[in-house]
């Protein structure tokens, strides 16, 4: 019996060893993304982090929050946010996305950020509508993006005839259901905008300053007398004053170029409009105004920059084309913009 006991103990030892080893083999290893993509992910993670945790007030923040909750990482810190972003980008944009970016210059790094933002915006369009009975339903969480798409449809009635409610914006307010015909119209708009975002993703070189590059930002970068980008203040206003933003971040440069363009438009006599001009007068030395006023001011400059961009784009495209370019720019900008400041802008 003693010999049997010894043999049993011996047989159990390898089994116990396997139990101890298994957690190590199942532990997630370091990111396999290219160094350039990891830098982009780090910048985005900083923009999405508030007080050490994920800020879910933006569309991208909400999407990432759901992904982290599904993987048991809800409430995680910066490293968890980076890991979740890494996974999300490869799920949406492909396993090999960004693989060749390490050999790119600073311009290529900037282009990679643009590709990520356009690609994520495009992928989010695919998830806005969920099939239900003979139509589709949508979530209230996606209303900021849905509203911009509905406004695009209302601006192009020849392409998208008005529904019974009188406008597509009103249609979204009635309930969260679209019937078969309404779904077909909405999906048509999503396809058009998705194609624009795809084109911008593929032609991401436009942000580097080559006005012939096309895609997102090319009209904005064609500002030879521009004093330079204003950087990240708009993102600070969007994600919160305590946000850990990167002063040289590509997202800040993208939005900064639009703000620069808006400022040039205002100086040329374009005006900011009543709500923003109220905030503008508050920036007198010694005056104190809440952060919301700053968000409204910068949001107004951003809007003016978009309008100026479209005015330039109108020389090569009109109607639905220029309108599509506008809504695509807005959707990309909204990815990191908090819901509160979307309303202010």
UniProtKB/Swiss-Prot annotation:
Polar residues: bias regions: 219-228
Short name of one Pfam family: Harpin
UniProt main location, coarse: secreted
Name the record gives this protein: Harpin HrpZ
Encoding gene, per UniProt annotation: hrpZ
Biased segments, Gly residues type: 206-217
Keywords: Host cell membrane, Host membrane, Hypersensitive response elicitation, Ion channel, Ion transport, Membrane, Repeat, Secreted, Transport, Virulence
GO cellular component: extracellular region; host cell plasma membrane; membrane
Subunit: Homomultimeric.
Written domain comment of the UniProt record: The glycine-rich region is characteristic of harpins.
Example GO BP: monoatomic ion transmembrane transport
Residue segments, region 2 X 7 AA repeats of G-G-G-L-G-[ST]-P: 213-275
Similarity field: Belongs to the harpin HrpZ family.
Stretch list, region Disordered: 202-247
Sequence repeats: from-to residues: 213-219, 269-275
UniProt function note: Harpins are proteins able to elicit hypersensitive response (HR) in non-host plants and are required for pathogenicity in host plants. HrpZ forms ion-conducting pores permeable for cations. Such pore-forming activity may allow nutrient release and/or delivery of virulence factors during bacterial colonization of host plants.
């Amino acid at each position: 019996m003693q010999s049997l006991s010894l043999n049993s103990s011996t047989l159990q030892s390898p089994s116990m060893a396997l139990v101890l080893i298994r957690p190590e083999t199942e532990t997630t290893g370091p990111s396999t993304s290219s160094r350039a993509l990891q830098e982009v992910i780090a910048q985005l993670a900083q923009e999405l982090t508030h007080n050490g945790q994920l800020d879910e007030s933006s569309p991208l923040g909400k999407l990432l929050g759901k992904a982290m909750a599904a993987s048991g990482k809800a409430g995680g810190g910066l490293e968890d946010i980076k890991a979740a972003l890494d996974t999300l980008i490869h799920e949406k944009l492909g396993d090999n996305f960004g693989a060749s970016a390490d050999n790119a210059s600073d311009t290529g790094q900037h282009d990679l950020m643009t590709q990520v933002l356009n690609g994520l915006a495009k992928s989010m369009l695919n998830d806005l509508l969920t099939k239900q009975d003979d139509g589709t339903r949508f979530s209230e969480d996606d209303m900021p993006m849905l509203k911009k798409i509905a406004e695009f449809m209302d601006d192009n009635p020849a392409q998208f005839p008005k529904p019974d409610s009188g406008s597509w914006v009103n249609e979204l307010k009635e309930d969260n259901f679209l019937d078969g015909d309404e779904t077909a119209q909405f999906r048509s708009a999503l396809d058009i905008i998705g194609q624009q975002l795809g084109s911008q993703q593929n032609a991401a070189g436009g942000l580097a300053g080559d006005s012939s590059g096309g895609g997102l930002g090319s009209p904005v970068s064609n500002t030879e007398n521009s004093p330079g980008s204003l950087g990240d203040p708009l993102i600070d206003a969007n994600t919160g004053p305590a946000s850990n933003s990167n002063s040289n971040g590509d997202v800040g440069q993208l939005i900064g170029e639009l703000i620069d363009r808006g400022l040039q438009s205002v100086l040329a006599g374009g005006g900011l409009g009543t709500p923003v001009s109220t905030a503008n007068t508050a920036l007198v030395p010694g005056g104190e105004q809440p952060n919301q006023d700053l968000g409204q001011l910068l949001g107004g400059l951003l809007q003016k920059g978009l309008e100026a961009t479209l005015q330039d784009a109108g020389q090569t495209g009109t109607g639905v084309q220029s309108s599509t370019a506008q809504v695509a720019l807005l959707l990309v900008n909204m990815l990191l913009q908090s819901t509160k400041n979307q309303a202010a802008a």
